Amino acid sequence: MDPAGGPRGVLPRPCRVLVLLNPRGGKGKALQLFRSHVQPLLAEAEISFTLMLTERRNHARELVRSEELGRWDALVVMSGDGLMHEVVNGLMERPDWETAIQKPLCSLPAGSGNALAASLNHYAGYEQVTNEDLLTNCTLLLCRRLLSPMNLLSLHTASGLRLFSVLSLAWGFIADVDLESEKYRRLGEMRFTLGTFLRLAALRTYRGRLAYLPVGRVGSKTPASPVVVQQGPVDAHLVPLEEPVPSHWTVVPDEDFVLVLALLHSHLGSEMFAAPMGRCAAGVMHLFYVRAGVSRAMLLRLFLAMEKGRHMEYECPYLVYVPVVAFRLEPKDGKGVFAVDGELMVSEAVQGQVHPNYFWMVSGCVEPPPSWKPQQMPPPEEPL
């Protein structure tokens, strides 16, 4: 039983939630959509709320760092993927991060990038939908109160930054589309379609070194000197960036890429079913990369097919997929940017490791993702 008296993996009834809403996200209609589509359903489900509007970048991060979390049964994030990124990193920056990250989270889509909400919609067995239909589905998930544990990606950069990702890290084509389509934010998710066509017209390649720890080699060795962290979980599979990757890692021989994508969930957008191979096992992420040499026509076909998750059926020799638990990416020429959960970062060496079943989210079922033997882990502690 959790402290609120409800069974493990279920929010209590009645329920108290703090709603963090970005009124400028996506098409700028989040507050209007909350009043029209979310609030009536919450009232019927006996979910009381306090609404807080974010005013600037990292405002939500600052709020959750100091918020008295015991007042709430869950934190509801209504915006795009970037606001959930802020909230999770704010929780992990608290002195009580180990308990703070157990506070259940809920994603209500109202941004231009709604990949996390689309993934949860998919896991619940709903049809792929967008806009108000996706918002309604995710609100219904909140009303049903079921929780599921989620993987968390820990990242370290060459400049010494340590951060956490709830969705993805992209480099190359996808990150450039994120950056260059920012000016079309008012189009909602259509900005990414427009950005894709514009970037295809001037296709770039990016030079770098990619290495990863595949699922099958996790049990073989553990680094003698894992990377040192001041706060947060220990990344036992990572060594300092100035050292070579461990010998049991795979180093990709190619050094010219169109894109690299580490993805924790099924969707990269509400209409981008990027990982049709199924939900990641506990402690695993999807790693995709596209090698240089792919034609514009093939890349366009892949992105169009991704809407229905059929891009892997092309068996494109330039598109590589592997399930991994850790990776390292070292850009060589300074070109391009990183996009972490849709938030842009400078291009520099970065490495990351997945932590299994690390936090709770409102989902369609209480079942954790499938486990695989070498790193089978229990769900996180009971939600607070």
Swiss-Prot record:
ATP binds at residues 22-24, 54-58, 86, 111-113, 185, 191, 341-343. GO terms for molecular function: acetyltransferase activity; ATP binding; calmodulin binding; D-erythro-sphingosine kinase activity; DNA binding; lipid binding; lipid kinase activity; magnesium ion binding. Residues 12-159 form the DAGKc domain. This is Sphingosine kinase 1. Its main location: cytoplasm. GO terms for cellular component: cilium; clathrin-coated pit; cytoplasm; cytosol; early endosome membrane; endocytic vesicle; intracellular membrane-bounded organelle; membrane. A motif (Nuclear export signal 2) lies at residues 161-169. InterPro entries: ATP-NAD_kinase_N, Diacylglycerol_kinase_cat_dom, Lipid_Phosphate_FormReg, NAD/diacylglycerol_kinase_sf. Gene3D superfamilies: 2.60.200.40, Probable inorganic polyphosphate/atp-NAD kinase, domain 1. Changing residue 81 to N: Strongly reduced enzyme activity. It is a peripheral membrane protein. Substrate binds at residues 79-82, 178. A motif (Nuclear export signal 1) lies at residues 147-155. Acetyltransferase activity increases in presence of the kinase substrate, sphingosine. In Purkinje cells, kinase activity on sphingosine increases in presence of VEGFA. In neurons, kinase activity increases during the first 24h in presence of Amyloid-beta protein 42 to decrease after 96h. The modification Phosphothreonine is found at residue 193. It is found in: Cytoplasm; Nucleus; Cell membrane; Endosome membrane. It comes from Homo sapiens. The modification Phosphoserine is found at residue 225. Its EC number is 2.7.1.91, 2.3.1.-. Keywords: ATP-binding, Calmodulin-binding, Cell membrane, Coated pit, Cytoplasm, Endosome, Kinase, Lipid metabolism, Membrane, Nucleotide-binding, Nucleus, Phosphoprotein, Synapse, Transferase.
